[in-house]
Amino acid sequence: EDLACWDAEALMKMRILQQLTSTALIGFRLDIPEQAGSQDVDFFPTANICHLPICWNQCQPEPGPLKLEGVIDQLEWARGREMRVMAGPLLRLDDEHLPAWLDCAAESFQQLQAATRDHIEQLVERLHDKVDIWHATAGLNRPHDRKFSEEQRLRLTVDAVETIRRHDRHTPVVVSFDQPWGEYLAHQQQDLSPIHFAETLVRANLGISG
């Protein structure tokens, strides 16, 4: 942890020296409280971006239209403080994120794929004018309890980015990874390390910004 902080400080100093005007984004995670919009943050004057998680299970606890009132309230909270917003991840594969009604068995991959596209499509259509960065997926490089293959997880990542791009061609899109140094490879055999997973996405020319 100390090494990571030292490395981040050194990189920031180098970046400031190289650029007359800093383009660095410094922010925090903005969770949705029970009373959405009531949250206040003492250090927000020092930040220029907030990360707004979007949980599929909370937005769509049962089949039907998404319930985005809390998300929209927090987006407006950030806009009222002239902050940029990174929204997402729009897809994770853990139990906390996926709705209980969704059949996520490995043999039902095509149904999950279709439901994921529909979910992301609804989000982007309703929020695209309020979001500055889309966080498409998180942690799909690593195996999960649901036993999806590496190819299926890569396909879901590509689908998420392509769905965003079909409905929003301009907003930057990012993808994040669990254990980017590949610690899980010591006990979980995979063909693609995190860096190769990322390289595959970059070579696909999907329009990912980071």
Predicted regions mapped to residue ranges:
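Glycine-centered flexibility motif
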Residues: 1, 27, 88-89, 205
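Mature N-terminal, pre-catalytic/accessory segment of carbohydrate-active enzymes
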Residues: 1-45
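A short linear-motif detector with a strong N-terminal bias
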Residues: 4-9, 28-31, 112-114, 152-154, ...
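Noncatalytic carbohydrate-binding groove/subsite architecture in carbohydrate-active enzymes
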Residues: 17-23, 150-210
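Short, acidic/polar
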Residues: 30-44, 70-74, 113-125, 188-203
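Alpha-helix initiation/capping motif
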Residues: 37, 67, 98-99, 108, ...
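Long, low-complexity, intrinsically disordered polar/charged segments
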Residues: 39-66, 202-210
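Substrate-binding cleft and catalytic face of glycoside hydrolase catalytic domains
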Residues: 45, 49-61, 72-182
